[in-house]
């Protein structure tokens, strides 16, 4: 179970996701927790070892195959950045996220990610698809072609 957005395992707001804006896109809206997002990403440890990625080599949005997931259904650090960092990511944005273990996979880790791991993700938001039945104006949603 993940801690609530922006909170650590004890519920205190003293852990932060650090976001470095690499590229500003042309999107105008950020995802909400129930939206499905399409992203290109690379995850690595602070020593530079890559543990997960959706593309090989340098990011080329034209040839990369984005992964999709629900914005509120991932580790708290990702959800926080997608929805709240600098007002939330917009379609076309590329950010580098520095996620402390409390907002990542915690003290227990996950799969090949050891506990207490600080994670670095390079994330490119490609598209946002709202949950069916969610009321949003057409102008609020951009979806990748």
Where are the language model's segments positioned?
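Cross-family detector of peptidyl-prolyl cis-trans isomerase
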Residues: 1-145
């Amino acid at each position: 179970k993940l801690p609530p957005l922006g909170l650590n395992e004890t519920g205190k707001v003293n852990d932060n996701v650090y976001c470095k804006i690499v590229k500003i896109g042309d999107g105008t809206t950020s995802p909400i927790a129930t939206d499905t997002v399409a992203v290109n990403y690379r995850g690595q440890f602070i020593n530079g070892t890559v543990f997960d990625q959706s593309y090989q080599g340098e990011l080329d949005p034209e040839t990369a195959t984005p992964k999709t997931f629900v914005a509120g259904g991932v580790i708290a650090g990702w959800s926080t950045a997608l929805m709240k960092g600098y007002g939330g990511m917009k379609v076309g944005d590329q950010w580098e996220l520095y996620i402390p273990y409390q907002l990542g996979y915690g003290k227990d880790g996950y799969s090949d990610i050891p506990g207490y791991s600080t994670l670095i993700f390079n994330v490119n938001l490609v598209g946002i698809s709202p949950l069916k039945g969610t009321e949003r104006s057409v102008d609020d949603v951009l979806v990748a072609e």
